Amino acid sequence: MAEENVIFVGKKPTMNYVLAIVTQFNNNSTSRIVIKARGKAISKAVDIAEITRHKFIQDAKYDEIKLDTESLQGEKGESNVSSIEIVLTR
């Protein structure tokens, strides 16, 4: 899958990500988009997927949802961070 079909969720407003997904579905004629998030952004990723499905692209469906734990090196040693991948298809 092309990297352009991946949305990395961070600190931007939720609707920015929703708009990016809607734009990719409409302009790139892609049928599959992956939403990725880690840590505190996981709840925002779920909100983004739900807003996209219920308000903008009603025929979008969840193809796959992956949960994982990633180990990150920080100042205080290694820490575990949860991550999610939500695959939307149309």
UniProtKB/Swiss-Prot annotation:
Subcellular location: Cytoplasm; Chromosome
Stored Gene3D superfamilies: Alba-like domain
Pfam name, any one: Alba
GO CC aspect terms: chromosome; cytoplasm
Keyword Cytoplasm: yes
Post-translational modifications reported in the UniProt record: Acetylated. Acetylation at Lys-11 decreases DNA-binding affinity.
InterPro entries reported in the protein's UniProt record: Alba-like_dom_sf, DNA/RNA-bd_Alba, DNA/RNA-bd_Alba-like
GO biological process, alphabetically ordered: chromosome condensation
Main location: cytoplasm
Family recorded in the similarity comment: Belongs to the histone-like Alba family.
Annotated protein name in UniProt: DNA/RNA-binding protein Alba
Name of the gene this protein is made from: albA
